[in-house]
Amino acid sequence: MDEKIIKKNAVPVIAAMITALAFSFTGLPMDGNTSAKKMSDVYNGLGCMSLLAWILLLILYVKGWEGYRKYRNWQAHVLAVIFSAGMLLGTSYFTNGNWDFLFGAKKQILISAGCFIGFYIICDMGITYFWRIPEMEFFRKACGRIPAREEEVMWFRLAKISMIIGWTPFILAFLPGSIPADGFRQLDVFLGAMPLDNHHPWVLTMIMGGLLTLGKTIWCYNFGVFLIVIVFTSVEIWCYSAVVRYLYRWKAPKWILFGTVLLFAFVPIFGSYAQAVIKDGLYTAVITLYFAVYIDICHSFSKRKAVYLFLLGISVCLTRNNGIHLVLPSLILLFFFLVKGARKYAFIVAVCVFACYLGVEKGAAPALGVAPGSRCEMLSVPFQQTARYLREYPDDVTASEKKAINRILDYDVLAEKYNPELSDPVKITFRFRDNDEDPKLDGYMKDYFKAWFAMFRRHPGVYIQATLNNTYSYNDPFHLGRGQQGVYRFYIDKLYQKKAGIDVSYVGPKKIQYIFRLYDELWMRAPGLGLILSAGTYTWLTLLLMGYLMVKKQWKKILIFAIPVLNILICLVSPVNGLIRYMWPVMTIMHYADAVLVDSAAGTKNAFKLKKIHHFIKTSFIQNADRSP
């Protein structure tokens, strides 16, 4: 009997040891000269926390190994490989700024392979059990309730009141509101202190400037800033409350409803951005509601919902410049969700959104003298690769390549200014920031990319490392990027303030503001809570939910995740590594996209079945489906 127990538990015990060892490496590479004294820098497996982690892993593996062997599948294996690679790369780049932890000396390759195995085991096991949760009885019992109109209104009001309670302390502490660089730049553009351009959405710039001017007319600039904060906050609260309402309609269990309300009301990123004059809070709220209507129109089509989708779609496009890159593909994919009778409406919505967007950006903007945004904003990846190349191989550049680079960027300072996790210092050297329409630029860009490609052929590894170093935190939840310059915007930018001469200042005591700053930073560093504000968490959640739908062979539902996937891809070419502000829309979407998983697990009839959609199409043209957005 004892022999059987030993044989049965031998594999999980060894697996737990390998995983514990993998988590004990610091990320520093070990070369051939590493002495025993320096091993503590490379490996730290002693201490209470390491012992506790090993005991916990041992219990989990021994208890869950049989179930893991029974339910594991190839989809989980693939995801586990992706997650493990992300963790390894994140560890290496966070610690060293390169991939030496993976591909250093020969010994190091063996160490990294062992770490990969340890990470793989826990990821594979975790994914397998995560996908089993919806099949469990307690989960099924929580689903499938019948919605009631009174309760629906109650949840809408509860969400609204909770957000008012959770956000108001931030707004009061930083009265009249923080104005970070991005927000102040928009105000400066409106007031004529800077050229009128579309670096930030110009329509939103006009709205912000109009509210500022109205407040100044009524009282003072402080009141104008407060007016922007209050108007934007009111819209955001309404959007998020409507999302909770949709969740209730979809028969989401109460724990998802409560969790979503708590997320929106009390996770500090929401309150922290509510008090700031910046586009991100408004954009995130609008695209979150857009995604809710998008899912709802898949559940049950109606003309009214198509109108809501159009209005929200164009709002997304006008609150962030890359919004069109999320909205248009999602509307094209909507065509495949609906049966023939409804597809024409998806096509009409897509055409109307695109036509309105072109009318605003290509018609109204030039007529009003709005200059287009600089093209350098889209070139973070190649600019970072060039700068890293010059840092690593400054002598391996030909005269013609140097000339081509220098026409576009300041060649002499690129290597010095290069920040592996933030492309802004390199982009600032772009020579055509204020003259993007110069006819010479197109020719210069062709020469630059010829040089860029020639250098890539000589040292491709540098380019790969530059990209990995600028993106690892989007793939690894456990290492926050170092290029963020502060996650929250608790300041009034003095540089932009001087340009327009706007007299704005905080009215609250600095001690209270310090408490809120400290609270936000502690939240980010707290075990468990910090993962809520880690960009990599939402890349993983997106892949987990998509993987579950693949296992269930619900291929059409995977298309619903077009918006999160496109947002993640945009993050990967963004200027900052692991910035949660860029991943914020995916955060808000993921915490109610779980309703799709619930719908799949509960076995409820849903509109992803064509017959159900067809039934709603027939009835929607006669009856009004829903009267609230």
Language-model region placement:
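Transmembrane-helix motifs of polytopic, lipid-linked glycan transferases
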Residues: 121, 227-250, 289
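Short acidic/glycine- and proline-prone juxtamembrane loop motifs at membrane-interface regions
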Residues: 272-282, 319
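Membrane-proximal stem/loop segments at transmembrane-domain junctions that anchor or position
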Residues: 369-507
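Membrane-interface alpha helices of multi-pass inner-membrane proteins
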Residues: 306-320, 352-357
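Membrane-interface anchor segments at the N-terminal boundary of transmembrane helices
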Residues: 35-51, 223, 227, 469-561
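Specific aromatic-rich, kink-prone transmembrane helix
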Residues: 121, 191, 282-299, 313, ...
